[in-house]
């Protein structure tokens, strides 16, 4: 193994990533920094990982045929694409027995 520039990666390359390393290309790790989860997300063999993810424990080996997109094709922010498609609900109701009374109190407090 030797260190190389991420820019020379092509689909199908084998990459070894150790504790604290940044994933240099989309591949099949911990992506909590990209997705916003408060705890690291455990990845298992065959799971997808994204460029910018960080290896938190153990080691990760991207096997031959696993590196996906590189360069301009890398999906830098999968969470952003997901969020752009979401809309906040008009209102949220917990369907509590006193929901109507709580709504009236909230309206009066405005």
From Swiss-Prot:
**For this chain's UniProt record, which GO biological process terms are given?**
proton transmembrane transport
> Which residues of this UniProt protein bind Mg(2+)?
72, 76
* Matching InterPro entries: ATPase_P-typ_transduc_dom_A_sf, HAD_sf
Q: What are the recorded GO MF terms, alphabetically?
A: ATP binding; metal ion binding; P-type proton-exporting transporter activity
| Membrane topology summary | Multi-pass membrane protein
Ranges for the region named Disordered are: 88-110
E.C. designation(s): 7.1.2.1
Catalysed reactions listed for this entry: ATP + H2O + H(+)(in) = ADP + phosphate + 2 H(+)(out)
Please note every region of biased composition (Basic and acidic residues). Answer: 98-110
Quote the Gene3D superfamilies the UniProt record gives: Calcium-transporting ATPase, cytoplasmic transduction domain A, HAD superfamily/HAD-like
**Catalytic class of the enzyme:** translocase
Where found?
Cell membrane
KW Zinc-finger (keyword) present: no
Changes after translation: The N-terminus is blocked.
What exactly does this protein do? The plasma membrane ATPase of plants and fungi is a hydrogen ion pump. The proton gradient it generates drives the active transport of nutrients by H(+)-symport. The resulting external acidification and/or internal alkinization may mediate growth responses.
User: What does the similarity note say?
Assistant: Belongs to the cation transport ATPase (P-type) (TC 3.A.3) family. Type IIIA subfamily.
Protein name as it appears in the record? Plasma membrane ATPase
Source species: Avena sativa (Oat)
């Amino acid at each position: 193994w030797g260190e190389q520039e991420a820019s020379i990666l092509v689909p199908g390359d084998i990459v070894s990533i150790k504790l604290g390393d940044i994933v240099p290309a989309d591949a099949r790790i911990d992506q909590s920094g990209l997705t916003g989860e408060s705890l690291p997300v455990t990845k298992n063999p065959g799971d997808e990982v994204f460029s910018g993810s960080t290896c938190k424990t153990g080691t990760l080996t991207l096997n031959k045929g696993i590196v996906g997109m590189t360069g301009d094709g890398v999906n830098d922010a999968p969470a952003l694409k997901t969020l752009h498609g979401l809309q906040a609900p008009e209102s949220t109701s917990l369907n509590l027995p006193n929901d109507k009374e709580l709504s009236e109190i909230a309206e009066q407090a405005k």
